[in-house]
């Protein structure tokens, strides 16, 4: 097949969103020879704050630094957590959220995907998903039964773990009785390990770096600074996308084959509803003609964490900034040699809060400094103690609570109403409470050699209901929203296992919004995998990669 670049504003495929899934599916489709236009509302990812892994800390701690790369969403007041409005960072930049996240690389538990398949989602079982992961990975240990090599996304371990990090790993094994894992992304996830990251050689390996910049297929065109207003649907078929660019000019991009939405759990659901696909009554409330009555925006869920911070005596464990400035100078002079060449997270554990659990229901992220999450009185302020410290983000990875995403208006520039309904199911609070007590057991271990001085937050005297109250005051999101365009074979599904939107031809959704249920761990790697597997689904169509773009 002859490769041919997009002609003007027309291509075989128009992909909305250049994030984790969008970059992956667009890169693979273009690699096959198909012409692809990717629409991105944000600007270039070739910025120091984006490229240097360790700068993700100050980026998220200082709102002014993050603002150029973030949609800046907030949830509606969350009535089960003291009516707090939670920040919902979403990448508004080439690479999407993969350009501003913590670069933690977690595939998820194999049982997650077998569960999807058991619900009727053929082709999404653990073995099928493993094949997609292997295609996308370039793991530092090389290829094996469960890991890939030579793919677009480089995956490495943190090479500069601090003393407290190594003590934490041993303490977790001692206190919980779990295994110290060499690779939690292989056959078994349960245990404690050094963190894996999609970063290498001092650079963030976002989806855009791997699939757009490095693959660089000639038939791929990225249009940045372009906001998608709605999908253009004619006679029940998606034929293009109406957009407005940075100058305010409005135009339509035509798709000869398919329109693919990869705008994430917020953007894809919002765009479907603006295009007439969603709950009929809700669309009518906003004066939108109904083209397909589907449960768009339902099934919203997310990972939530509660941070515990401990003051340590070790002089080898860093405090918080100003050491960022020193590290930045070293990193600029000798790339890849300072802690700024790595993710801010250094260790991870996947544990069971109950032996009755079939898979680990708790994830611990270790930060080598003090970090206290925002409280209800200061929703965007990060309180940071300057003393050497270790912080554990005690994370609920299988929430039972479910929320919704709805339109605030028919204006595509208006932020939607994001209601996670955090902790609406009491079982979620109990897991966070049990997990917090487990973290205390870990930090009481002799493996720390007496270096733990005190519990800075929430405070060792807090137990029972007082601890639960502290969790309600401080628990917040890990920014892993999923599920608003649920994949399935029943009436609660928005897309089928082929990612095609029910009732509309030529339209797919390919991102974390399609997850029937959230994966066990950080969701960036699964989102990239969804793009990788989604490309195979598109190309498996009889004329999936054939050129249909018209033009002279």
Predicted region positions:
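N-terminal redox-cofactor-binding region of secreted/periplasmic oxidoreductases
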Residues: 1-552
